[in-house]
Regions:
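… and, occasionally, acidic/histidine-rich disordered N-termini of signaling adaptors
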Residues: 87-288, 341-356
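Generic hydrophobic alpha-helical scaffold/packing signal
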Residues: 1, 29-32, 199, 262, ...
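Charged alpha-helical signal-transmission linkers that cap and connect PAS-family sensory domains
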Residues: 20, 68, 165-166, 170, ...
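Hydrophobic positions within repeat-based interaction scaffolds
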Residues: 1-89
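Residues that scaffold the ATP/ADP-binding catalytic core of kinase and kinase-like folds
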Residues: 7, 245, 268, 299-300
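C-terminal catalytic subdomain
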Residues: 222, 279-291, 296-356
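Conserved acidic
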Residues: 35, 63, 160, 294, ...
Length: 356
């Protein structure tokens, strides 16, 4: 009985050991499987993370590369811009130097032109009661005034040469010298003879003929010769008339216009050199004579931006005839400035007033 019991115990023990061993093996397998799965999961996570890092690194690298290319392109553009800027600055400097040289030359020419105009002392010694309103459009002027005296005869002119600025100034100097030559060398006293002489000499000096229709270097002028003893005024004009205000007692004062020949000095009409005519006017003491170019009347301005015109000029002269010549000049200057306003001056301006 004891032996049988012992066998049963042994069998039970062996079975339990076998079962324990089997369960242990299963647990070990499960643990192993878990370890394998865990390692596989970790490996997958690592691969995904590595892939993401590679993608991120790629985009970062590409962005840096594009930025580098953009920086290089920007540097190239900046370099080109800087080179262009330096070129422009250099050219600007050259232009400024050239402009300075040109302006200096024009200023010097201005001094030469002003030097040939009658000095104030000479002018006012001949005509104490007079004025000259002279306002060039540019530094140099195509307008000029001229005066000369021989015995009892006084020669006075207001001239407007073709153009303004440098071209007008060059022609004005030529014509100024021709007037001097006509009176002082050729001893001409009649204003028509003087203009005919200047006309002939000007065409020779400029090699100008009727065949050269493109050449239009001429001069509009009003030329007066006053006999200071008899007060007879001899006048000849090329396009430019003169105004006279006669001081007559107990009569309505009017302004009269002495008309000019309708062609300029230096012109050909119908293939012929034109001859100027002269007109004689007997003046009285205190009569007023006005000579002028077209610059004042042609100035645009006023509320509507229109030309000033000769009628307004006549009205101003007539309204202010009893004022001194200095006051008349001041009124003309103020009227011109106010009329022009902010508009550009269109031409040289010259107005001469003389009280006989």
């Amino acid at each position: 009985k004891d032996t049988l019991y012992n066998k049963d115990q042994t069998s039970i023990t062996a079975e339990m050991q076998t079962r324990f061993a089997t369960e242990k093996k299963q647990q070990e397998n499960e643990i192993l499987n878990l370890q394998v799965k865990s390692e596989s999961f970790i490996k997958t996570i690592f691969i995904i993370a590595a892939g993401l890092l590679l993608v991120i690194a790629f985009f970062i690298f590409r962005g840096l590369r594009q930025k580098q290319k953009a920086n290089i392109a920007l540097e190239e553009k900046n370099k080109i811009i800087e080179e262009q800027k330096q070129t422009v600055e250099h050219q600007k400097h050259i232009v400024e130097e050239q402009n300075k040289d040109i302006t200096d030359s024009i200023r010097y020419a201005e001094r030469i032109q002003n030097a040939i105009l009658p000095p104030e002392k000479q002018w006012y010694s001949i005509f104490p009661q007079s004025f000259v309103f002279y306002k060039p459009k540019d530094i140099l002027s195509g307008d000029f005034y001229w005066i000369e005296q021989k015995g009892d005869l006084v020669f006075v002119a207001a001239a407007d040469c073709t153009g303004h600025g440098v071209p007008g100034a060059l022609i004005s100097i030529v014509n100024y010298n021709l007037l001097n030559k006509a009176v002082l060398e050729k001893d001409l006293n009649n204003p028509a003879d003087i203009l005919n002489y200047v006309n002939h000499q000007l065409t020779l000096a400029l090699h100008q003929t009727f065949q050269e229709s493109s050449v239009k270097d001429g001069m509009d002028i009003s030329l007066c010769v006053l006999n200071t003893k008899t007060l007879e005024l001899n006048y000849s004009g090329a396009n430019n008339p003169i105004y006279i205000i006669h001081q007559i007692e107990n009569a309505v004062t009017r302004i009269s216009e002495v008309k000019a020949d309708k062609f300029p000095v230096g012109a050909f009409v119908d293939e012929q050199v034109q001859s100027f005519t002269s007109k004689q006017i007997q003046l009285q003491k205190n009569d007023l004579v006005y000579l002028f170019s077209d610059g004042f009347a042609d100035q645009f301005g006023g509320d509507k931006g229109k030309k000033f015109k000769y009628k307004q000029l006549k009205d101003i002269l007539l309204e202010n005839q009893n004022l001194s010549m200095i006051e008349q000049r001041s009124i003309l200057e103020n009227k011109f400035t106010n009329w022009k306003g902010k508009l550009e001056q269109v031409d040289d301006v010259l107005v001469i007033g003389i009280k006989v």
